[in-house]
């Protein structure tokens, strides 16, 4: 059994670690709430653009935008959104597993995959696998800016426009609630059609578009795709903070359990030490 002094040192060390994990839990909770607000604020904007795009596309029967046209798929592009930091449980690895399953499906169909990566964890993971990375963005921080994300998005948009990829997907962790974050892979290009129920056809959409619907459609499509990826980044950030909060709470609770166990061991060691001292005193007295 370890000595009492050694056990006291271990208890002090675990208590210091517990303070750190508790502080990280509180910080993650605060950041998660702020990110949730940002996520909720950007979602209506994205949804409205999507509806406008669908109405313009339905009204321009003679014009087929390439972003809305299905192709034979020979090569696909994936924008994968991961975190820059760790200590967030299995958040990243669950997403990576989901993407690798998709990549295997494409490989079985003899379709190659190209990647645009957001987040340093994804960069290191996919580069170690030797996959083809077209673009990467890291260090977005807790307040991601659209300007930092646009480059990676436009790289994939241009690749689709030039026929270098035939479909584009975005992969990220969707924030469901504090305890649940779900890996999601959604198609960006060609843009999936909205159902009539989602379009809200009962509303008044008899608009005159300037300069003309085709030019407006091209501009809106690019803006919509940028917004969708930004939404994915914010969603993933909220998931990261929630996962980190849960992980740090578990670490704090485990530290408390370990402290209790060490305290029990310390008490037993102290009791054994006192018993030995008493035995020595009694033995000495008997010898006299």
From Swiss-Prot:
Protein name, entry field: ATP synthase gamma chain
The record's keywords, sorted A to Z, are: ATP synthesis, Cell inner membrane, Cell membrane, CF(1), Hydrogen ion transport, Ion transport, Membrane, Transport
Q: Encoded by which gene? A: atpG
Which lineage do the record's taxonomy fields give for this organism?
Answer: Bacteria, Pseudomonadati, Pseudomonadota, Gammaproteobacteria, Pasteurellales
Q: Cross-referenced PROSITE patterns, in alphabetical order?
A: ATPASE_GAMMA
Q: Which InterPro entries match?
A: ATP_synth_F1_ATPase_gsu, ATP_synth_F1_gsu, ATP_synth_F1_gsu_CS
| Localization in the cell | Cell inner membrane
Main localization of the protein described in the UniProt heading: membrane
What is this protein's function per UniProt?
A: Produces ATP from ADP in the presence of a proton gradient across the membrane. The gamma chain is believed to be important in regulating ATPase activity and the flow of protons through the CF(0) complex.
Q: Does the keyword Ion transport apply?
A: yes
Q: Which SUPFAM superfamilies match?
A: ATP synthase (F1-ATPase), gamma subunit
